[in-house]
Swiss-Prot record:
The lineage of its organism: Bacteria, Bacillati, Bacillota, Bacilli, Lactobacillales. This is Manganese import system permease protein ScaB. It comes from Streptococcus pneumoniae. One of its GO terms (cellular component) is ATP-binding cassette (ABC) transporter complex. It is found in: Cell membrane. It holds the Pfam family ABC-3. The chain crosses the membrane at residues 18-38, 40-60, 61-81, 136-156, 172-192, 194-214, 220-240, 244-264.
Amino acid sequence: MITEFIDGLQQFHFLQNALITAIAIGIVAGAVGCFIILRGMSLMGDAISHAVLPGVALSFILGINFFIGAIAFGLLASILITYIKSNSIIKSDTAMGYLSLPRPRSHSDRVAKSSTDLFHILFGNILAVQDQDMWVTIGVGVAVLLVIVLLFRPLLLTSFDPVLAQSMGVRVKLYHYLLMVLLTLVSVTAMQSVGTILIAAMLITPAATAYLYANSLWSMMLLSSGLGALASILGLFIGYSFNIAVGSCIVLTSAIFFLISFFIAPKQRKNKHALSPH
């Protein structure tokens, strides 16, 4: 089975594109997911994944690239969530839940009438990734990682202690919006591998697993990116070998990593002992 997969990589260009794209998305989603976890915004990935679907539908209606509509609606959703949180007594999780409600059936009907398979939009179809899509994913991934590296310190401060960051003159809201832009970019590019439904799991699960082991944000990001890439490789292998949805296999593999780590991670075991009455 492994030999067949390796032979397929050597023979089929589409499988090479799928592997490179899956690894790129796994790495960048793992890195961005760490900041989402630390900020307590795990629902944001799910909210944006719901928000981009009407953007995809509108793109098909207008006959433009779905990437444009998805990015526009994703950014609009992230801005609205932040605005509602900052200018009302409504908490961010409530705003995220509200913006996750936009009648998916009507948007799905519009997409279903297009030439694109609705199943591929909802659950991804990484085996159909073209050269242009692969290079766009790599370009977005490199840009996102570069921004994180260059602005690591302010992103770190605003994630752990926004009040302290504000007192130090750091523009907390600016970096929050920047992170939302990065999250939207990653969510839209991840549509090709896992689809809109499973984007949140791709963002959160590797980061949550890494959180159980890491003692610093750098180590958490590196481990999360590594786990995301490994889950992508194994998920692609399983999906290709057994002819099942690759996106679901990637997410399921990542979930297995988390479940195993939940029971064996040193930090988790220490926490259990701390909670024990004996």
